[in-house]
Amino acid sequence: MNDMFSLDMSRCSLTECIDKMCEIKSRSHPKIKQNYKMLVNKLEDIEKQFGCTIMPAMISSVFWNHFVPFLAEQGLKYSTIGHVKANLIAVLNWSSKYGVKLNQSYNEVDVPNYISSKIALTPDEISHIYHFKIGKEPTFSFRSKKVLKLRKNKIETLERVRDMFVLGCNLGQRYSDLVRISPENFKNGQFSIVQQKTGNKCFVPINSLSIDSRITFAILEKYGYHAPYTGDINNYNTYLHELLYHIGEDFMDEVHIDNKINGVITRETKLRYQLISSHSARRSFATINTMRNIPRSKILRATGHSSEKAFNRYICYDDE
């Protein structure tokens, strides 16, 4: 009986520690392994590059000085690198309770909390997206830039993606929660759902917090109070970029992105539509309602954020 609940991880490699933690915690957090998949992949890349097996005690300030630039060179945003860092430190802290020895500098890492590519849309832009007639105006190929005629099934897909994005702007939820909506989530003009990521229950009074309640109810009724689009999030973002590319206009503006690491600032230029994703809808909801002077407590109750610090990262003011 005692052996059943004892755990000695003193000889485990870092990836073995991750596997063991995910195995144990998956009983209460079924999707935890998916959350750590990127970390495992990047650690395996490092092991392959240097021909070694990474042990927990090898994670030090020296390791971080190599690992962070390595992730940046692979094209990861600093917000994503920060997520990888947090996951790795969480694994080390958990493993240390079961015999794993840590280097004293295992958590001495500074990933810039500095990224200026956050995008929030205005109410006019959201309305423009909703009212854009897909296939009725000259449409250019997403890749070859030649004028083309969209097929009926492609038009239907882009319409569903458009409605899904606009609905996200009006309800302020993550994509993983929007795909799960059903009539049971709506009662007396209020939307509520237990969020998949946090387990928090949020409440959105549609008439007072949605960006446009008329459009919100029109979309909901069109799809029987279910999600307009339920495909893979990567496909969703690809279709969203294609939709915004077809709309053109303000979404084709150049945006300069400044990133800072190890004291060096680098700048890259992208078109605005390339920076808009599923999460931009949630940012737009938070930013617009903040600018409307809606009480912060009501917005947090709608977005499900448990702290103002976490919520503030969603706000994109004019200078951003």
Region spans (language model):
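A Lys/Arg-rich helix-loop hairpin that forms a DNA/phosphate-binding surface
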Residues: S6-C12, K31-Q34, E47-P69
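Short, aromatic/basic-rich helix-turn unit that serves as a nucleic-acid recognition element
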Residues: D3, S10-K42, E73-G75
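Basic, Lys/Arg-rich DNA-contacting stretches centered on the C-terminal catalytic core
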Residues: V111, K146-K154, S176, K187-Y225, ...
